[in-house]
Amino acid sequence: MKTIEIRRHSIRSKPGDHLNQQGITLARLVGENLGPFDRVITSTLPRAFETAIAMGFAVDEQIELMSTYGNDIEREAPWPLSCAGYAEVVRKGGAAARYADQLVAIYTKLANYLSDGRAALVINHGGVAEMGAVSCLPNADHFAWGSHFEPCEGIRLFWEDGKFVIGEILRVSI
């Protein structure tokens, strides 16, 4: 089985693009219990790659698609929604569903890159993380997943026999 861990970036002071000290501290604490990862991918925004680095992992690739999803998708899926809310929006089709399909393609390519028993880390953003997660596991009980992902929270996706088979929600207690 292969594992892809998708997490939202750590804490920043809005409207800034960079992590604040609290965000660096949180990412360091979370990172102490993570890994190892064969591949680390983030969005192109500083707070995403800073989170990976603060967690203790070098970034192998940055992907623009994971940086933002634009106004059309924001209208369909305004931040923040619960995981079930994002799943409902994606099921309706439209721009959010097309975007989520692109995320699934990235995660599928990443899973195919990994050897069996290995793992990868993805750091992106609120809304992006949830839409990708619900689309990787469209038949999961998204209500049980709870609310949107707070900083450094996310999901651990398990890949087996050419598909995502289960997800473990990753919550952080501060």
Question: Residue ranges of each PLM-predicted region?
Answer:
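Active-site-proximal alpha-helix that buttresses catalytic centers in soluble enzyme cores
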Residues: 1-62, 88-96, 149-154, 159
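Beta-strand elements within well-structured catalytic alpha/beta cores of enzymes
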Residues: 2-8, 41, 113-128
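Short, solvent-exposed loop/turn segments at secondary-structure junctions
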Residues: 10-13, 46-47, 126-129, 136, ...
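Phosphate-handling substructures
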Residues: 13-15, 54-109
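A generic local structural motif
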Residues: 25-30, 106-110, 142-143
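Flexible, charged surface loops at secondary-structure boundaries
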Residues: 32-36, 112-117
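Short amphipathic alpha-helical segments
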Residues: 52-54, 133-136
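Acidic, low-complexity terminal tails and accessory targeting/binding regions
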Residues: 65-78, 116-118, 134-174
